[in-house]
Amino acid sequence: MLLRLLLAWVAAVPALGQVPWTPEPRAACGPSSCYALFPRRRTFLEAWRACRELGGNLATPRTPEEAQRVDSLVGVGPANGLLWIGLQRQARQCQPQRPLRGFIWTTGDQDTAFTNWAQPATEGPCPAQRCAALEASGEHRWLEGSCTLAVDGYLCQFGFEGACPALPLEVGQAGPAVYTTPFNLVSSEFEWLPFGSVAAVQCQAGRGASLLCVKQPSGGVGWSQTGPLCPGTGCGPDNGGCEHECVEEVDGAVSCRCSEGFRLAADGHSCEDPCAQAPCEQQCEPGGPQGYSCHCRLGFRPAEDDPHRCVDTDECQIAGVCQQMCVNYVGGFECYCSEGHELEADGISCSPAGAMGAQASQDLRDELLDDGEEGEDEEEPWEDFDGTWTEEQGILWLAPTHPPDFGLPYRPNFPQDGEPQRLHLEPTWPPPLSAPRGPYHSSVVSATRPMVISATRPTLPSAHKTSVISATRPPLSPVHPPAMAPATPPAVFSEHQIPKIKANYPDLPFGHKPGITSATHPARSPPYQPPIISTNYPQVFPPHQAPMSPDTHTITYLPPVPPHLDPGDTTSKAHQHPLLPDAPGIRTQAPQLSVSALQPPLPTNSRSSVHETPVPAANQPPAFPSSPLPPQRPTNQTSSISPTHSYSRAPLVPREGVPSPKSVPQLPSVPSTAAPTALAESGLAGQSQRDDRWLLVALLVPTCVFLVVLLALGIVYCTRCGSHAPNKRITDCYRWVTHAGNKSSTEPMPPRGSLTGVQTCRTSV
């Protein structure tokens, strides 16, 4: 038990000549530098930052004298205590043969005249960064370890241009002077005070003195005032003639002193600013041999060749400055994190990106996008909408058809002279959502029987109807046709003029009625009804509409064409003979029908034969000259014409040899009730065949291209892989040599370097 108490007491007693370990910071200064001990647990990086904030750096004891000063400062610390010093080594930078073993000082160099390693150098790959720490007890040797571990404290070093000695104790002084260093360490146990330190002296008389370690005009560094520091009163009411402060001497004399940042002028009373004309690049402080000293801001250090200039310090060379990535720039550095990590608030550490941060970023991005879209909507003007429907396009594979054109003289309601002609080229598909119309009506021109003109059915008052020349189906009878008036037939020979007979037929089915019949129903007063041309005959308007009974039927017969005359002669002679005297009318010219001119009349049965019966003159309505009416545009109905007509539309220009529109009478539309013919069906078949050609072309073009490519590949193959030498058998390439020694002199000698008696040839396997 006694032995244990003795050992505990020995461990508690400090070693001889060494300062005991205290938890308070302390410092030891020399003529050119100061070392300060801060017993606070820090990592290497944190310790380096703490020293930089105070204007210094981690301790770099390069000489034995500096090492001895460090030993006296550390004294006796804990048995296992460690203190960081300014030595570090980067990964894979081992140099065991050098004094510092690959370590460098935090100042960036490897110059040293002193080392104190605790362990010998070893050969190794040095895969990680290492930092050096000083033992707090014993011989204060250097140990290397991980830079991220926190140790018991750290040592800082502060360099200055000069230092002032400690003030001696004077008579009348209340106690030792208290010094405040530039690195904010307050103590009264300094032997040397760095440049810029302040000494506070307390006198017994109640007054004190404050001194500043500054540069002297003669050179060097000294205190701003010399003793005695505790004089009697003698400044008087005018402050002793001093500009700033007046100090009374012991013998009653007074001395002047300047405030911080100023120095006493040569007259001893006024004060001047030493940094007003100092050539410092960044910061200037009064003091020093020249009255001022230049300092650099954080991130810079004084240049070695010129103390007035400042150069950048590469902080990224210090191990552990940043947790992941470090970027150095002039005057500082910045830490970055790899993908998936984010920088913490301290600006050094990195942590994995959390879900809350990612969600906040996404919300911010969505908010910015929403704001951008709202801005675009506000800037985009609204388009004006007139409230009308847009006409849809028809089916793309159905080509729009146009009503036939029979030339300029046969168009109704010609424009006046000088009025420009306009082409009405519009598609014929019906607009969407259109109102229901009446039954479909079409006029059919048959190519197998003579043309019959009937004017007993006028055009219905609809803007969507047009006369259609169709060869596909017979006309449909209207539901409520308007009242109709007969028209005068074209002029023929007098010997063939047979009067018409008006007869009343009962209502019969379509198949039991006479060959060509048009029914007349009670008249009604429709709106304006422009006539529509359905054949090549001029249109003639009757002067009035004669009322007829509801059951009245009008049958119109045309005389047969004489055998000795062709249809062309009949129509041509009709231009020269006037109408009968009992049938008043207008002398007109009927142009040839393209159907009768190109297709001869075919024999028909008795039902389809044409007969005429004389009709009294009183029953024939007189014709009257036509009056021009505004043209009506045909829409929403297709027109199918026979193959003898051209599909192209004639231009609306006057032609020579054609009467003026004003002098040509017009006839009402003549709807034909002839049945479909083979010629019309062949026209539709030709149109369908024309549509099928595109499919054939679409199939043939790729096929031809493919055949051309195959032909080209075959030609290339034949030219590249031509005929080769015939293959030989294996017995033709080798032969047995039985008498190698009896080889005749006539046998050719094999070439030098080749196998004797072996023939080479190319064989195929």
From Swiss-Prot:
Residues 312-351 form the EGF-like domain. Residues 162-232 form the Sushi domain. Keywords: Calcium, Disulfide bond, EGF-like domain, Glycoprotein, Lectin, Membrane, Phosphoprotein, Signal, Transmembrane, Transmembrane helix. GO terms for molecular function: calcium ion binding; carbohydrate binding; extracellular matrix binding. Residues 1-17 form the signal peptide. It is a single-pass type I membrane protein. Disulfide bonds join 131-147, 164-213, 203-230, 316-326, 322-335, 337-350. Residues 548-675 are annotated as: Disordered. GO terms for biological process: anatomical structure regression; endothelial cell apoptotic process; fibroblast migration; fibroblast proliferation; lymph node development; positive regulation of endothelial cell apoptotic process; positive regulation of fibroblast proliferation. It is found in: Membrane. One of its GO terms (cellular component) is cytoplasm. The keyword Protein biosynthesis does not apply. Interacts with PDGFRA; this interaction promotes PDGF receptor signaling pathway. Interacts with integrin beta-1/ITGB1. Interacts with insulin receptor/INSR; this interaction diminishes INSR autophosphorylation. This is Endosialin. The lineage of its organism: Eukaryota, Metazoa, Chordata, Craniata, Vertebrata.
